[in-house]
Amino acid sequence: MDIKRTVLWVIFFMSAVMLFDNWQRDHGRPSMFFPSATPTKTVGSAAPGTTTPGTQPADLPATNAAAPGNAPAATQSQLVKFNTDVYSGEIDTRGGTLSKLSLVNKGDGKQPDLVITLFDRTANHTYLARTGLLGGDFPNHNDIYTPLPNQQHDLTGDEKSFQLSFESPVKGGVKVIKTYTFTRGSYVIGVDTKIQNVGTAPVTPSVYMELVRDDQPVETPRFSHTFIGPAVYTDQHHFQKMTFGDIDKNKQDYATSADNGWIAMVQHYFASAWIPQQGVKRDIYVEKIDPALYRVGVKEPVPTIAPGQTVDVSARLFAGPEEERMLEGIAPGLELVKDYGWVTIIAKPLFWLLEKIHSYVGNWGWSIVLLTLLIKAVFFPLSAASYKSMARMKAITPRMQALRERFKGDPQKMNSALMELYKTEKVNPFGGCLPVVIQIPVFISLYWVLLSSVEMRGAPWILWIHDLSQQDPFFILPVLMAVSMFLQTKLNPTPPDPVQAKMMMFMPIAFSVMFFFFPAGLVLYYVVNNVLSIAQQYYITRMMGQTKAKAA
C-alpha cells in the first residue's frame, strides 16, 4: 500500500510541477527539464520578397513609437478621440494610427468601473495598430494625416455605426485616405485604405498592417500568467506563437507568406489581430525594432495604379476579449488566441460544457461546482474501483505490517509473502493508480480552461468571492482545500514507514500554500472535487464494511 500511495502522490506532484514548468516556458523562461529546441528558420517556402524570421524587411519605414507629447513641436500631431458602446479611444494624426483603445465595461471585480486599456502609447508603455504604404516615398505611419471635416466621433442614439477618415499628404504622387468604421456591439473595426494616384506616372505600392508593442508584462495574480507575444495563423501551418525571448534570440518560427489567415498580439484574456482580405497574397514579418519594442505585420502588394485611378484595400482589426464563440464567428482559427496548448482537445469540450451550464444557472462559480459534479459522476466507476482497492489494502494493512516485521531481514521472502497475501485476498496494490492517471489530463485541461477564460474575470460567486480570476482575498478556499486534503489522507491507510507517513502529512500543507495564489475559480474546483472524493470514498468504504458484516 505504501508503494501505491507513493506512486499516487508522485503522479499528483509531477502534474503540478509540469503545470508550473509549462507556465515558465509560456513566459519565455527556460524549461526546468528540457532546453529550448532551436526551431526551423522558416515554415514552408517563402515567396520572393518575403522575410526570414528575425530579419527586418528592408523597405519598411523606421518606427516612431514615441508618445505624442515627446515629439518636437514642429512635428506635433493631434489625437482624435472617439467613443462607441464597447470602445473609447484615440487616433493619432501621425500616420492615422490607432494609438489608444480602451474596452469599456471590462473592469475587474475590485474596480468594476475600471476600463481595460489595450492599445496605448505613453512614456512607459507602447501598444498600437498602424498601417502605411511601401515601395516608394509614399505616405506611411510617420506622416501627419488630416482628419476630414464634419465627422462624427461618437456612437449615439440608435445608430449602428460611424466612420472616421484621415487624409495623408501627397507623397510620391500618391494620396491616402484611411477610414475606420466602428460598429455597435462589435470588437471588429473596419479599416479601409484608399490609395489615389494623383501623379503623372503609374505606381505599384504595397500596404503594410502591423501591431507594435513592448514586452511589458500584463498585471495578473501570481501563478496566473499566460502567454504574451505575437502569433500568426495560416490555413497551412495553423496557429504559431512566439515569445519575445524567441524573437530576441532570432528563434521565432512562422509562415512568411500566405493568402489567408491573420496576425495577432496575444496577452492574458485579450488580443488584437489584423485580418486582411482572404485570397490576397501577403508577406508576414515578426521582428524586434527597438531594445524593448516588437512588431508583427503583413505586407500586401497592390496592383499597378495608373494616374488618376484609385485602389481600395480593406482589412479588419479585432481588438477585444478572448471569448471563444465570438472569435469563431470573426475569422477561421481566431479562437486559438485563447491557447490551451497540448490539452486543447480536452479543454475545448470542457469549456463548451462549462458555458452550457452557465447558460442555465447564470453564475460562473456555481457552473464550476456543477461541472465538477458531472466530472465526478463520469469518473465514478473508476473512482469506486480505486476506493475499493484502497479499502481492501487498509483491511490487510495489519497483516502486511506483521509480514514486514517477520521478514525484515530478508527482503526477497518479505516480497514473496506480500505477493501471496495480495493474491489470497484478491488485492491489486496498484489498483488505485489507474483512475488518478486517467484524470490527470482532465486536471490539467480544467486548469487551463479556468485560467484562460476571460469570462471568469470580474465574475462573482458568493459572499466574499467577487472575482473568480483573482485569488481568494481571505484565503478561505485554500484553507478548505488544506482541510479536505488532510481528511483524504486520514481516510487512506497509513504508510508503515514513519518518514513516508510524515511526508503524506506534509503534502497537503505544501500544496495548499501553493494554492493560496491560484485564482479562486480554480481553487473552488479542487475544493469541490476533494469534498466529493471524500464523500465517495466514505460511502464506498462503508458499503464494503456492511457487505462484509452481512457475509459474516
UniProtKB/Swiss-Prot annotation:
Gene Ontology terms, MF aspect: membrane insertase activity
Membrane topology label: Multi-pass membrane protein
Gene3D superfamilies, A to Z: 2.70.98.90
Keyword annotations: Cell inner membrane, Cell membrane, Chaperone, Membrane, Protein transport, Transmembrane, Transmembrane helix, Transport
Membrane-traversing stretches: 3-23, 364-384, 430-450, 504-524
Region feature Disordered, mapped onto this chain: 35-59
A Pfam family annotated for this UniProt entry: 60KD_IMP
Record flagged with keyword Transmembrane: yes
Gene Ontology CC terms: plasma membrane
Functional summary from the UniProt entry: Required for the insertion and/or proper folding and/or complex formation of integral membrane proteins into the membrane. Involved in integration of membrane proteins that insert both dependently and independently of the Sec translocase complex, as well as at least some lipoproteins. Aids folding of multispanning membrane proteins.
Membership in a protein family: Belongs to the OXA1/ALB3/YidC family. Type 1 subfamily.
Protein's name according to its UniProt entry: Membrane protein insertase YidC
